[in-house]
Protein backbone atom coordinates (compact mmCIF):
# COMPACT_ATOMS: atom_id res chain seq x y z
CA UNK A 1 0.00 0.00 0.00
CA UNK A 2 2.24 2.79 1.20
CA UNK A 3 1.72 6.49 1.16
CA UNK A 4 1.55 6.86 -2.62
CA UNK A 5 -1.60 4.77 -2.98
CA UNK A 6 -3.49 7.44 -1.04
CA UNK A 7 -2.49 10.21 -3.48
CA UNK A 8 -4.50 8.53 -6.22
CA UNK A 9 -7.74 9.39 -4.43
CA UNK A 10 -6.91 12.90 -3.28
CA UNK A 11 -9.82 15.25 -3.72
CA UNK A 12 -7.80 18.14 -5.11
CA UNK A 13 -6.67 15.98 -8.05
CA UNK A 14 -10.15 14.69 -8.76
CA UNK A 15 -11.43 15.66 -12.17
CA UNK A 16 -15.00 16.05 -13.28
CA UNK A 17 -16.71 12.79 -14.20
CA UNK A 18 -17.12 11.83 -17.84
CA UNK A 19 -20.91 11.63 -17.72
CA UNK A 20 -21.15 15.26 -16.55
CA UNK A 21 -18.78 16.43 -19.29
CA UNK A 22 -20.75 14.37 -21.82
CA UNK A 23 -23.89 16.25 -20.74
CA UNK A 24 -22.06 19.57 -21.16
CA UNK A 25 -21.08 18.66 -24.71
CA UNK A 26 -24.53 17.37 -25.65
CA UNK A 27 -26.28 20.78 -25.93
CA UNK A 28 -25.20 23.92 -27.76
CA UNK A 29 -26.41 26.15 -24.93
CA UNK A 30 -24.11 24.55 -22.37
CA UNK A 31 -21.13 24.71 -24.74
CA UNK A 32 -21.74 28.41 -25.43
CA UNK A 33 -22.21 29.08 -21.72
CA UNK A 34 -18.86 27.46 -20.90
CA UNK A 35 -17.03 29.22 -23.73
CA UNK A 36 -18.40 32.69 -22.93
CA UNK A 37 -18.08 32.86 -19.17
CA UNK A 38 -18.14 36.16 -17.30
CA UNK A 39 -14.91 37.41 -15.74
CA UNK A 40 -14.26 35.67 -12.44
CA UNK A 41 -11.18 36.70 -10.48
CA UNK A 42 -11.23 33.53 -8.36
CA UNK A 43 -10.45 31.30 -11.36
CA UNK A 44 -7.18 31.04 -13.30
CA UNK A 45 -7.04 33.40 -16.27
CA UNK A 46 -10.19 35.12 -14.98
CA UNK A 47 -12.19 32.11 -16.21
CA UNK A 48 -11.68 32.97 -19.88
CA UNK A 49 -9.52 30.04 -21.04
CA UNK A 50 -11.46 26.84 -20.33
CA UNK A 51 -11.05 23.34 -21.73
CA UNK A 52 -14.49 21.71 -21.72
CA UNK A 53 -13.22 18.17 -22.30
CA UNK A 54 -10.85 18.24 -19.33
CA UNK A 55 -12.92 20.67 -17.20
CA UNK A 56 -9.84 22.81 -16.51
CA UNK A 57 -9.19 26.53 -16.50
CA UNK A 58 -5.93 27.70 -18.06
CA UNK A 59 -3.95 30.79 -17.13
CA UNK A 60 -3.40 32.09 -20.67
CA UNK A 61 -4.47 31.38 -24.24
CA UNK A 62 -0.98 30.02 -24.89
CA UNK A 63 -1.41 27.49 -22.09
CA UNK A 64 -4.77 26.46 -23.54
CA UNK A 65 -3.26 26.08 -27.01
CA UNK A 66 -0.43 23.86 -25.76
CA UNK A 67 -2.88 21.88 -23.60
CA UNK A 68 -5.04 21.11 -26.64
CA UNK A 69 -2.00 19.55 -28.35
CA UNK A 70 -1.05 17.46 -25.32
CA UNK A 71 -1.43 13.78 -24.54
CA UNK A 72 -3.67 14.31 -21.50
CA UNK A 73 -6.24 16.27 -23.52
CA UNK A 74 -6.21 13.84 -26.43
CA UNK A 75 -6.71 10.91 -24.06
CA UNK A 76 -9.66 12.67 -22.44
CA UNK A 77 -11.28 13.38 -25.83
CA UNK A 78 -10.89 9.72 -26.75
CA UNK A 79 -12.60 8.67 -23.50
CA UNK A 80 -15.50 11.03 -24.25
CA UNK A 81 -16.19 9.46 -27.66
CA UNK A 82 -17.95 6.49 -26.06
CA UNK A 83 -21.17 6.26 -24.09
CA UNK A 84 -20.69 7.50 -20.51
CA UNK A 85 -20.83 4.96 -17.69
CA UNK A 86 -23.97 5.28 -15.57
CA UNK A 87 -25.92 3.24 -13.05
CA UNK A 88 -28.04 1.88 -15.92
CA UNK A 89 -24.93 0.26 -17.43
CA UNK A 90 -24.09 -1.55 -14.21
CA UNK A 91 -27.72 -2.63 -13.74
CA UNK A 92 -27.80 -4.02 -17.28
CA UNK A 93 -24.57 -5.92 -16.63
CA UNK A 94 -26.22 -7.51 -13.60
CA UNK A 95 -29.34 -8.32 -15.62
CA UNK A 96 -31.69 -5.68 -14.20
CA UNK A 97 -33.61 -3.19 -16.35
CA UNK A 98 -32.03 -4.40 -19.55
CA UNK A 99 -34.79 -2.88 -21.69
CA UNK A 100 -34.28 0.52 -20.05
CA UNK A 101 -30.57 0.33 -20.83
CA UNK A 102 -31.17 -0.66 -24.46
CA UNK A 103 -33.64 2.22 -24.88
CA UNK A 104 -31.04 4.62 -23.46
CA UNK A 105 -28.34 3.35 -25.83
CA UNK A 106 -30.73 3.71 -28.78
CA UNK A 107 -31.59 7.28 -27.70
CA UNK A 108 -27.91 8.20 -27.44
CA UNK A 109 -27.04 6.76 -30.85
CA UNK A 110 -29.98 8.42 -32.60
CA UNK A 111 -30.31 11.87 -31.06
CA UNK A 112 -27.67 12.79 -28.49
CA UNK A 113 -24.64 11.29 -30.25
CA UNK A 114 -24.89 13.18 -33.56
CA UNK A 115 -25.71 16.44 -31.78
CA UNK A 116 -22.69 15.97 -29.50
CA UNK A 117 -20.44 15.35 -32.51
CA UNK A 118 -21.69 18.49 -34.24
CA UNK A 119 -21.15 20.47 -31.02
CA UNK A 120 -17.60 19.13 -30.79
CA UNK A 121 -16.95 20.17 -34.41
CA UNK A 122 -18.25 23.68 -33.65
CA UNK A 123 -16.11 23.78 -30.50
CA UNK A 124 -13.01 22.76 -32.48
CA UNK A 125 -13.69 25.46 -35.09
CA UNK A 126 -14.19 28.06 -32.36
CA UNK A 127 -10.96 27.12 -30.58
CA UNK A 128 -9.01 27.04 -33.85
CA UNK A 129 -10.24 30.48 -34.86
CA UNK A 130 -9.69 32.10 -31.45
CA UNK A 131 -6.28 30.54 -30.89
CA UNK A 132 -5.00 30.98 -34.47
CA UNK A 133 -3.23 34.28 -33.76
CA UNK A 134 -1.83 33.22 -30.38
CA UNK A 135 1.92 32.74 -30.23
CA UNK A 136 3.12 29.30 -29.20
CA UNK A 137 5.50 30.62 -26.56
CA UNK A 138 5.53 33.58 -24.26
CA UNK A 139 8.44 35.26 -22.47
CA UNK A 140 8.80 34.29 -18.84
CA UNK A 141 9.80 37.78 -17.73
CA UNK A 142 8.24 41.08 -18.86
CA UNK A 143 11.56 42.68 -19.72
CA UNK A 144 12.53 39.61 -21.78
CA UNK A 145 9.84 40.46 -24.33
CA UNK A 146 11.41 43.85 -25.05
CA UNK A 147 14.86 42.26 -25.35
CA UNK A 148 13.54 39.58 -27.71
CA UNK A 149 11.89 42.19 -29.94
CA UNK A 150 15.10 44.25 -30.01
CA UNK A 151 17.15 41.17 -30.91
CA UNK A 152 14.82 40.17 -33.75
CA UNK A 153 14.86 43.74 -35.08
CA UNK A 154 18.67 43.76 -34.98
CA UNK A 155 18.88 40.40 -36.76
CA UNK A 156 16.51 41.47 -39.54
CA UNK A 157 18.41 44.73 -39.93
CA UNK A 158 21.71 42.85 -40.16
CA UNK A 159 20.26 40.46 -42.74
CA UNK A 160 18.94 43.33 -44.84
CA UNK A 161 22.32 45.12 -44.82
CA UNK A 162 24.11 41.87 -45.68
CA UNK A 163 21.78 41.19 -48.61
CA UNK A 164 22.08 44.81 -49.80
CA UNK A 165 25.89 44.68 -49.81
CA UNK A 166 26.01 41.53 -51.97
Curated annotation (Swiss-Prot):
InterPro entries: C2H2-ZF_Maturation_Protein, Matrin/U1-like-C_Znf_C2H2, Znf_C2H2_jaz, Znf_C2H2_sf, Znf_C2H2_type. The keyword Zinc applies. A zinc finger (C2H2-type) spans 49-73. GO terms for biological process: ribosomal large subunit export from nucleus. A motif (Nuclear localization signal) lies at residues 7-16. PROSITE patterns: ZINC_FINGER_C2H2_1. Its main location: nucleus. One of its GO terms (molecular function) is ribosomal large subunit binding. SMART domains: ZnF_U1. Pfam families: zf-C2H2_jaz. Coiled coil: none annotated. It is found in: Nucleus; Cytoplasm. GO terms for cellular component: cytoplasm; nucleus; preribosome, large subunit precursor. Keywords: Cytoplasm, Metal-binding, Nucleus, Ribosome biogenesis, Zinc, Zinc-finger. Residues 17-31 are annotated as: Nuclear export signal-like (NES-like). Involved in pre-60S ribosomal particles maturation by promoting the nuclear export of the 60S ribosome. Involved in positioning the proximal bud pole signal. Present with 5630 molecules/cell in log phase SD medium. Associates with pre-60S ribosomal particles; released from the pre-60S particle very early in the cytoplasm. Belongs to the ZNF593/BUD20 C2H2-type zinc-finger protein family. This is Bud site selection protein 20. It comes from Saccharomyces cerevisiae (strain ATCC 204508 / S288c) (Baker's yeast). The lineage of its organism: Eukaryota, Fungi, Dikarya, Ascomycota, Saccharomycotina. The gene is BUD20.
Amino acid sequence: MGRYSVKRYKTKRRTRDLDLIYNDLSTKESVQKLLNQPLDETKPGLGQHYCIHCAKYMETAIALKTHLKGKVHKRRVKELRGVPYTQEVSDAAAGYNLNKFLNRVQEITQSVGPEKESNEALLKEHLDSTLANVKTTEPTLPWAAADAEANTAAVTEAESTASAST
